[in-house]
């Protein structure tokens, strides 16, 4: 399995049977400078969304139309995407597990919000925010936390799914900050590797992963992969 951070909370996950984009906010993403759009979206089969904010839905509609990718999202967000012309949708909700070729995806809790600004500037609620747990046939289990704060039921997520790789928001202000994110990883999970995200993009959130790296320093069993956007990481089952 290969995982590429595309800036902010966007990731490309490649396995033998699927190419999954998570929260594909590319155009207009300050953290995606230097990311080639065509290469980032090449061969995409699925798009998975954690919630309905514009910096996570991003280019979903355009990518889904161009590539015929299946979009996996909370039911309310999926309905809205259908109204925007997305044809291949697989809706779910918190606690639900959806099966696709080579992997399953489970919607778990996240502490955040989920809405999209309408043309008249009013926020339209788009269901609950989620974290996403991916179980693969031939690759380590992956947990993208979405946008969230720490919460004690992360312990249940670990008990039920035992994720080996974590994608963790660390930028503060709209999510937990680096120190709290490090606490979440250490207290509730046994990750082999973690990829921090939701930083180094907009100026009002943290510009570096320094606080997270410092918080993880006394937990050497977990490898922190805080590399520049565009870096490809490979993982074996």
From Swiss-Prot:
Alphabetized InterPro entries for the sequence: Metallo-B-lactamas, RibonucZ/Hydroxyglut_hydro, UPF0173, UPF0173_UPF0282_UlaG_hydrolase
Molecular functions per Gene Ontology: hydrolase activity
Protein keywords: Hydrolase
Domain of life: Bacteria
Hydrolase in keyword set: yes
Record-linked HAMAP family: UPF0173
Similarity comment: family membership: Belongs to the UPF0173 family.
PANTHER family: UPF0173 METAL-DEPENDENT HYDROLASE MJ1163, UPF0173 METAL-DEPENDENT HYDROLASE MJ1163-RELATED
Listed name of the protein: UPF0173 metal-dependent hydrolase BAB2_0644
Organism encoding this protein: Brucella abortus (strain 2308)
